[in-house]
Every structure is written in C-alpha cells, then in structure tokens.
Amino acid sequence: DWNTLLQNASHSGGINDSQIKLPLQLQWTANTGSNIFMTSPLIARQKVFIATTDDNTSLNTYICAFDFHSGKQLWKFRTENSVKNTIACENGIVVAQDASCNLYALDAASGKPLWQQYINLKNYPYLTEGLTIDKGIVYAGIGAGLSAYDLKTGKVIWTNTDWKQREGSTTTLTIAGDVLISGTQWGGLYGNDIRTGKQLWK
C-alpha cells in the first residue's frame, strides 16, 4: 500500500530499481471530472484515491476512489472546496482537508463520511497545506489551526497555541520522531511536539 505522500508520515519512502518490473505498460486511465493540483494518489485496500480542485466554481471538488486493477470509479465524495494538497489513508479511513478549512474523514470502502471538523485558522482563511496520519492520529491545519485529531472519532487531541501563520504554504506536515514539522512561506520552519502540540523550535 501507498498510504500517503512518499509512503509514510516522514515522507521518506520510495521504490528502488529492483522493485520495478520493466517494461512498464499503461494499465488504465480514468477521468476524475476535475483538475488535480498537488494531491498525490494513494493506494490502499486495492483502491486508488485522489482529490481534485476547481478554482473557478468550486462545484467540481471531490475525493474519488478507483479500482486498483481496472480503474473503474467506485465512489466520489463532494467536498465544499478544492483539496489542494496531500491526503492520507490509515485503517480504512481516508482523510483530506479542503481550501475552506474543512477536514474530512471518509470510509475507504464506501466513501461515506465518518466525521468532519472545521479547522479554525483565525485570521487566515485559506488552507493549501497537506496533512498526515501516524498511529491513529491525524495531523492537519497550519499555524493557529494546527491540530491533532483522533482518526476514528475526529476528537481534537490538541491545538497549537504557540505560533500563528502570516501566510500559507504548499508544504505537507511531516513527522520526524516525536516532532511534527511544518512551515509557512517567508515565515519559518516549525517543530511541534506530536503528543502535546507544544512548539519545540523555530
């Protein structure tokens, strides 16, 4: 499975040459019905997951699932706004955050919503960052809205209160040991404790 950007919450995975069987052949193509920005496809439970953007009308914004072998669309869930960046999947739950600061958790098998949370970014209204999951915890948002959530219930575990963003970025939250790493354009690189949310360094 390929559950998130570069396979793990540290974004340090990859495929070496010995795992690639040449020559590569196109197996299928599928139309998502909209554009894709920085959302990398996920592979989990014999499905491929992707999210879309629509900056013109916000009418064609979805999280989609396709059959891994055939490319047949299995389900499509409409989001309120564009999903700009990394989505993730763990234990049969797909999570994504949209530009309007909504955090979604969907059942990977059916696409049915399990829970939804609003990420309060205070004075910054637009979310373009990517999220991550590790050991049943979802890390999402940025700055004043940077938070940890229980994957199963959506319950907020902690919210960052130590720093606020002045602008957004195109980064994806990354875990290194017990540190959650995030950043903002021209603002800095931040490390927060993954257990408490306390800022450790900038």
What positions do the PLM features span?
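Blade/loop signatures of beta-propeller domains
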Residues: 1-26
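Extracytoplasmic beta-rich repeat domains
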Residues: 28-42, 52-61, 75-90, 115-134, ...
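A short loop-to-beta-strand structural motif that recurs across blades of beta-propeller domains
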Residues: 61-64, 102-104, 144-147, 188-190
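Short loop/turn segments that connect beta-strands within beta-propeller blades
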Residues: 67-70, 107-110, 150-154, 193-196
